[in-house]
Amino acid sequence: MKYYLNIFIFLTLIFSQVEQPYPPLDLVTIPTSGTLPKGSFTLESLLVKDGGIIPKLSVGITDNFYIGLSYGIQDFISEEKLDFNKPMPEVQIKYRIYEESETLPAVVLGLDTQGKGRFLSRYEDGDNVVANFQRYEQKAWGWYIVASKNWTLLGNLGLHVGLNKNTWETDPIENEDPN
């Protein structure tokens, strides 16, 4: 019985990937140049450390543009009281500025303000200069540009390259830490 169950799970994983109607929006948590088709939506959730969860709803406005909202909740899987990261949801926006061709990759410009982990606030006072910062344990991607090229050589093979800059989550004390 265990043998047949393993075969069933293996075949289900293989064939479910073939039927995917659109390219991946993210590789785990790293953005790609995939966008949602017009009129479609996704509802995803990401489990993070300390029993946190980040639900995310994204909607395809056009074939090249989508917008999403997410909200970080800490202690979701815990006996503690729920702790919401911020009073407002975070935003994800992605616009494909160049469609993938036979020779050139697809290119997207995006914004993701959702960081991972707890939202931290620190206020230093006393002998030090007053330093105020608010940021996530793992900073949000911020503004990013990603290029993706896919091949059907060995199934579905893709190469994704990108750059990002988060300009609003800063820490004046640990400014050298990119995370």
Q: Language-model features: where?
A:
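Transmembrane beta-barrel domains of Gram-negative outer membranes and organellar outer membranes
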Residues: 17-153, 166-167, 177
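Intrinsically disordered, low-complexity segments enriched in small/polar residues
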Residues: 1-2, 142
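Sec-dependent N-terminal signal peptides
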Residues: 3-15
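A mid-sequence, solvent-exposed acidic-amphipathic segment
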Residues: 161-179
